[in-house]
Regions:
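Acidic, metal-coordinating helix/loop segments flanking the phosphotransfer/catalytic sites
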Residues: 32-50
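Two-component/phosphorelay signaling modules centered on CheY-like receiver
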Residues: 11-31
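The feature encodes the CheY-like receiver
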Residues: 58, 86
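Acidic catalytic/metal-coordinating carboxylates
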Residues: 35, 61-64
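Active-site residues of response regulator receiver
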Residues: 54
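Short amphipathic alpha-helix used as the core "switch/output" element in two-component signaling
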Residues: 63-73
Length: 117
């Protein structure tokens, strides 16, 4: 069973992802957060296999959180999902250790497909 943690400031998006992922075999959403600080605390305790991470979060950016996750637990797969797919965000995310980078508006289904693998 692949354990997933969702980090996005949009409650609607977290709910949508949770509902979609609950239909995917061998995938379990073990937690979710709307900000980076709560997410980091939860991730340290819950130890997910994969984190779905938005870039724009209250308090700290998703890219900063990504760096902290990878420094602490480099084997966690981190999928960046954003509405702001600017080239500089993509480059910063990959440099910080992102495993995938998706536009959550245009490539939402691709996120789900990656998790099915």
């Amino acid at each position: 069973m692949k354990k997933i943690y969702i980090v996005d400031d949009s409650v609607k998006l977290r709910k949508r992802l949770y509902e979609l992922l609950s239909e995917v075999d061998n995938v379990q959403v073990i937690g979710q957060a709307g900000n980076a600080d709560q997410a980091l605390d939860d991730i340290r305790v819950l130890k997910p296999d994969t984190v779905l991470l938005d870039i724009r979060l209250p308090g700290k950016s998703g890219i900063q959180l990504l760096g902290e996750i990878k420094k602490w637990q480099p084997e966690i797969t981190v999928i960046i999902m954003t509405n702001y797919d600017y080239p500089q965000y993509h480059q910063q995310s990959i440099r910080a250790g992102a495993d995938h980078f998706f536009n959550k508006t245009r490539e939402f289904e691709s996120i789900i497909e990656v998790l099915k693998r």
